[in-house]
Regions:
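Short beta-strand/loop motif that positions the catalytic acidic residue
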Residues: 215, 221-223, 227
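Conserved alpha/beta-hydrolase
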Residues: 43, 48-72
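Active-site glycine-rich loops that stabilize anionic/oxyanionic intermediates
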Residues: 36-39, 225
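Catalytic active-site module of serine/aspartate enzymes centered on a nucleophile-bearing elbow/loop
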Residues: 245-279
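N-terminal cap/lid segment of alpha/beta-hydrolase-fold proteins
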Residues: 1-23
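Catalytic nucleophile-loop/oxyanion-hole region of alpha/beta-hydrolase
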Residues: 38-40, 67-97, 101
Length: 279
């Protein structure tokens, strides 16, 4: 399945974007995908293929410093510029469609964290139809030592563009060996994370868990209980405290990329059923 690719202009940066058109008559619904750390929106073609066959328009984009977007690998201008990419993305979707539609944002991993911050802090989030959040890094499977956490803000202020390996193991993404091999061979993936981005990811996760958050739209939160990258306990803690219509669905035995597991169609079907029930 081939996407129509285009560019978004965001605070002086050109962000790469994708549009997979519905392959059956439109159902009036749109999914906007927000990808994770080190990867890019083009990796979600399987999600797009499934939902476009159901009449959804599907869009995705590459974050700054990721994929085919501008910005040094793994770096951000600021956390505010990172979160506000969603507003730019939404405006591009609105500009591409000339008929009324219902917009669902789907965020995975780092993209899930950014989406949770957006949902809990932006008034414009209230105009969404729903959100799907998968495997957010609210708690890490291999958290940094406490001494590094305490120094993170200092290092980020002194050397915000300095990058290090994100230490992600491709074998922890999926049980599907082909997914792992494709991830490792993909020239648009990278393993870099800047001091500024890393600090803000840790800080945002702590902030979102420190007190109950209010989510203004229905939200489906999915997480594999065998995720070794982002510990499911963070999703459980968030869901137990959140104010709003939030459903946590745990997937027994699944790794980090629930949408890329051998049982991915079960994940898609569950999300479809949940979205259908919102009507």
């Amino acid at each position: 399945m081939t996407a129509t690719e285009f560019k978004l202009s965001h605070l002086g940066l050109a962000l790469h974007a994708y549009h997979w058109s519905a392959t059956t008559p439109s159902n009036g619904k749109v999914i906007g995908i927000i990808h994770g750390l080190g990867e890019h929106g083009g990796r979600y073609v399987n999600v797009a293929s499934y939902f476009s066959a159901l009449g959804y328009e599907v869009f995705a984009f590459d974050h700054q410093g990721h994929g085919q977007s501008e910005g040094a690998k793994g770096t951000i201008q600021s956390w505010e510029s990172f979160v506000s990419e969603i507003s730019t993305f939404r405006a591009a979707i609105e500009g591409a469609l000339d008929t009324p539609h219902k917009l669902i944002l789907w965020g995975h991993s780092m993209g899930a964290l950014v989406l949770l911050d957006y949902l809990s802090s932006r008034d414009e989030a209230e105009t969404l139809t729903a959100a799907v959040v998968t495997s957010p890094p609210l708690k890490l499977g291999n958290p940094p030592p406490k001494i590094l956490k305490s120094l993170a803000s200092v290092v980020a202020s002194i050397a915000p563009k300095l990058t290090k390996s994100n230490e992600l193991k491709a074998s922890d993404l999926s049980h599907d060996a082909q997914v792992v091999t494709s991830y490792q061979a993909d020239p648009h993936n990278h393993d870099r994370v800047s001091m500024l981005l890393g600090y803000h990811m840790l800080d945002t996760a702590n902030r979102l868990l420190a007190q109950p958050q209010s989510i203004p739209v229905p939200m489906l939160l999915m997480h594999g209980d065998a995720d070794r990258i982002c510990d499911i306990s963070g999703s459980r803690q968030f869901a137990n405290a959140v104010v709003g219509n939030v459903l946590l669905h745990e997937w027994p035995g699944l790794y980090h990329e629930t949408h890329n597991e051998p049982t991915q169609f079960d994940v898609f079907a569950f999300a479809k059923t949940w979205l259908d029930a919102l009507n």
